[in-house]
């Protein structure tokens, strides 16, 4: 799956844990993970990859489960995430909700999304992605025989 965010101004890269985080709720259950989010991406990064971490025991604690490749341009960031690392199955649709947060040093307090950093969407809202009506070809992993590269 690909996630892409654009910014109004040029991105200024930072090496801290709060730079351009992506929060994912992949099981559709608001009672699992931290405040419903099962994963946080990009708390750490290398030149080519960002971390994928699972929230542990519903707390602001993390367990690294893998990495995602990323690409950065002047005012955009794209993450290429394997569905199998975030609870999905290759070839099957995965519906989820997601939220981008930049420099939102929330430290486990979801209410701080309202006052710290930039978030999209704002406050406690999240974007919803529903792939339930897509065919197997449209939900395959990038680079596979049936993958279109447009997941």
Model-derived regions, located:
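Beta-strand-rich interaction surfaces with strong enrichment in secreted/lumenal proteins
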Residues: 65-70
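Short, well-ordered beta-strand segments enriched in hydrophobic/aromatic residues
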Residues: 1-9, 77-83
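Accessible peptide chain termini
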Residues: 1, 150-151
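Trp/Tyr-centric glycan-recognition "aromatic platform" motifs on solvent-exposed beta-strand/loop surfaces
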Residues: 42-59
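Acidic/polar low-complexity flexible segments
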Residues: 19-47, 74, 85-149
